[in-house]
């Protein structure tokens, strides 16, 4: 069923952050940083995949994402909902159900046998496709999925995520340059504010996280592993 009420953006962001904290999807570890896919260190990590195990929370967040899209993109803006492999697939299925639209998913790369396809499900030329993922950091992986969708002759001008890092200023511009608008529910800044309000972490940890969020590149550069070749 399509939601008919439209909560304020600020309330959606606050409640989304609260739910992520409640299920312990948020991890802050400034003194033993996580390693991102890029190889760079980060004191923050978020596991949106956990959401699928919490029916009330996942339903609420999908309602939030639905009303965000209806308000910002339009009520008749899409013909197909595509999930990005792997984390985006369950959320795309839930969004397709709410929007009463066909659902497909996009592989990261062709599987190498059979049809050797990147698109699974039925996607046809001219369809307006919404790309759904769990989160985005710098937007890079979204561009690959968008290109695969467009290669079918469909269009893709919107991507929707639950969580957007919101700390890399080039992200929005990169997506816009590719003709894609990003829709999201909350950012690290929303999570930090809610973490402070809930006393979920100690003050020292939150101060270090804020330092990272304010200038992630400098924080990472100061903590990158030393290059073994540098001393040769």
Swiss-Prot record:
Keywords: Glycosyltransferase, Magnesium, Pyrimidine biosynthesis, Transferase. Orotate binds at residue 137. InterPro entries: OPRT, PRibTrfase_dom, PRTase-like. Pathway: Pyrimidine metabolism; UMP biosynthesis via de novo pathway; UMP from orotate: step 1/2. GO terms for biological process: 'de novo' UMP biosynthetic process; pyrimidine nucleobase biosynthetic process. One of its GO terms (molecular function) is magnesium ion binding. The keyword Mitochondrion does not apply. It catalyses: orotidine 5'-phosphate + diphosphate = orotate + 5-phospho-alpha-D-ribose 1-diphosphate. Its EC number is 2.4.2.10. 5-phospho-alpha-D-ribose 1-diphosphate binds at residues 107-108, 111, 133-141. It holds the Pfam family Pribosyltran. Its cofactor is Mg(2+). Belongs to the purine/pyrimidine phosphoribosyltransferase family. PyrE subfamily. Homodimer. Catalyzes the transfer of a ribosyl phosphate group from 5-phosphoribose 1-diphosphate to orotate, leading to the formation of orotidine monophosphate (OMP). This is Orotate phosphoribosyltransferase. It comes from Cereibacter sphaeroides (strain ATCC 17025 / ATH 2.4.3). The lineage of its organism: Bacteria, Pseudomonadati, Pseudomonadota, Alphaproteobacteria, Rhodobacterales. The gene is pyrE.
């Amino acid at each position: 069923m399509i939601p008919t009420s439209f909560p304020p953006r600020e309330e959606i962001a606050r409640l989304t952050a609260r739910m992520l904290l409640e299920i312990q999807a948020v991890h802050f570890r400034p003194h033993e940083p996580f390693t991102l896919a890029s190889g760079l260190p980060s004191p923050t990590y978020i596991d949106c995949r956990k959401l699928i195990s919490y029916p009330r929370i996942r339903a609420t967040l999908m309602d939030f994402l639905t009303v965000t899209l209806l308000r910002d993109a339009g009520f008749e803006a899409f013909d197909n909902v595509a999930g990005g492999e792997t984390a985006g697939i369950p959320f795309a299925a839930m969004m397709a159900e709410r929007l009463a639209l066909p659902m497909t998913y996009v592989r990261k790369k062709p599987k190498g046998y059979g049809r050797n396809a990147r698109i699974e499900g039925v996607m046809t030329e001219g369809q307006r496709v919404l790309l759904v993922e769990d989160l985005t950091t710098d937007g890079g992986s979204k561009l690959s999925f968008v290109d695969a969708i467009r290669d079918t002759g469909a269009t893709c001008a919107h991507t929707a995520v639950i969580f957007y890092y919101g700390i890399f200023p080039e992200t929005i511009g990169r997506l816009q340059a590719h003709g894609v608008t990003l829709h999201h529910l909350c950012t690290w800044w929303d999570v930090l504010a809610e973490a402070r309000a809930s006393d979920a972490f100690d003050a020292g940890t939150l101060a270090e996280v804020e330092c990272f969020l304010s200038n992630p590149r400098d924080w990472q550069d100061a903590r990158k592993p030393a290059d073994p070749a540098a001393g040769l």
